[in-house]
């Protein structure tokens, strides 16, 4: 039997000091909070800021989705909310068009007007939590306009709202419904990105590597795609829109997929942080530490949730959630045990959200920054010796 990573790299039965003989600590790892940020961006990790623990909502009418969001808050959703657009809105089709008759509110929230967004956010605060609305690239500017308009209607300065409501077009070929031309989607994304950058609005644009990996890509390919997207978007904002890199880099965030190959998933995100830090400094000439840091959100892998024996998906979700926590993510969404055949039931959603709570409060993973960074594993046996 051959033991290998999902991208074909042979795995040895045991590893020792010789396997890291060429590694220099300051160059390749660094302390948490120090360049190249392999071990994380904050020296105190989750002690200073716990990751956002949330579930993705979106089914039925805006009123239905609003009830689900409130239910998630009652279940203990922490730090933010997340909604996904339905295919009608993502395809830029109006909700009352005949083409939309059988698709409104299917696989997402029917957000084709400001009124729909107001109903979605009824009695839900715009501040004090991150506001995330996922969907295709074409209606990105609409989703951003909804947030700004509703904030102004509530008497809130739009710069006080933070989250993500627009996405790059790179995810469209990998499972998203978007019939608009790539060039148009890119223009709309850059329009939204330039607007938030110049107006100091803390809404980010998603670069969703998750779509690629959920469509069959392996970890190495996903890492390459994610870095390529970052380089392209930041390059266009600097070269075509005239932004300073330090302003451009505040826009993108990376949504990565975390599967069940535990150590590979952790290594992938650690590598992403380090490689982006070096690209920011060496290619773009980053002038600040903040510009070398990438906001990374995690979604556990939906494609690993099987239709057969769905209760086994609880174990898969727990493993993936622990991996997501180990990498020092900013936010985490879980897939659910019924992910393969239905929108989350109340029980499935509660179990997935509780999985995050258990990982955060009962495993000790939040007690130490970068526990996967070997030193903890080495020190623990010494303490018991």
What does each model-identified segment do?
Residues 217-223, 259-271, 300-314, 342-352, ...:
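Short glycine/threonine-rich loop-to-helix capping motif typified by GTGT followed
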